[in-house]
């Protein structure tokens, strides 16, 4: 790519926004040119806005330190500076849905880390190795939004990204029942041990909302586009327990699968 795409980060001062900035440092395709956050951060440099709340293991990239934070609600102004945005905003689901579609309607593609649009029927939730064909639904979404270029696309819940690709590879053996237990790091809650010391040497055996996501979202990944919307698959039946563990980064999953056509060890 001869010229990098100009990227904006919505919700740039939060932990997920910081992760985007860290991962995109020196990226061969993308350059972070705009950071946007709440009105209380707007007008400050990114370094000033984040202050002592930088939570990444690596230092804050020099390229973003002096970027002036823009008000996330000044949609037209933010959109005019970028080719597309990554969304990591921390709002209610209805607010997230609304503001992401506002950006899309300015002809700015939105790639969202949030769960708000994961069940919007014409919004693709994609793991490229599993369901790249779901990007085709974007054309129907554009018609609904009245856009030529703008759209919203989302990623699935982090807890399923380890085992959903494996289950996809085993579809020929017709899995019909899946029991999974996920052991999820505190970074998934936007925390570090510094601001959540209670998690040291501790386990929380239930994470509100995570079980439903882990049980339903794989079915959407395996769904099909019909009449301009994504219709989720109905099998396998997935049962999941989600446990918060005292680990800073990285999730683990223990997954048990029943097949209608039992594979051999070699086939697996």
Predicted region positions:
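Charged docking surfaces used in two-component/phosphorelay signaling
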Residues: 187-268
């Amino acid at each position: 790519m001869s010229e990098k795409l100009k990227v904006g980060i919505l919700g740039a001062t939060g932990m997920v926004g910081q992760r985007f900035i860290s991962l995109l440092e020196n990226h061969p395709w993308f350059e972070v040119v705009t950071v946007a956050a709440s009105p209380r951060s707007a007008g400050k440099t990114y370094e000033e806005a984040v202050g002592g709340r930088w939570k990444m293991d690596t230092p804050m990239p020099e390229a973003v330190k002096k970027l002036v934070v823009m008000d996330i609600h000044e949609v037209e102004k933010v959109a005019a500076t970028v080719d597309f945005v990554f969304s990591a905003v921390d709002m209610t689901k209805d607010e997230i849905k609304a503001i992401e579609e506002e950006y899309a309607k300015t002809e700015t593609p939105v790639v969202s880390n949030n769960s708000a649009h994961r069940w919007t029927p014409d919004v693709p939730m994609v793991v490229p190795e599993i369901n790249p064909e779901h990007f085709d639904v974007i054309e129907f979404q554009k018609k609904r939004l009245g856009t030529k270029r703008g759209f919203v696309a989302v990623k699935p819940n982090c807890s399923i990204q380890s085992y959903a690709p494996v289950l996809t590879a085993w579809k020929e053996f017709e899995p019909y029942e899946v029991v999974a237990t996920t052991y999820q790091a505190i970074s998934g809650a936007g925390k570090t041990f510094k601001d959540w010391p209670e998690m040291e040497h501790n386990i929380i055996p239930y994470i509100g909302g995570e079980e439903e996501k882990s049980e339903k979202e794989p079915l959407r990944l395996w769904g099909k586009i019909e009449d301009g919307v994504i219709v989720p698959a109905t099998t396998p039946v997935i049962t999941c327990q989600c446990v918060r563990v005292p680990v800073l980064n990285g999730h683990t999953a223990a997954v048990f699968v029943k097949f209608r056509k039992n594979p051999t060890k070699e086939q697996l």
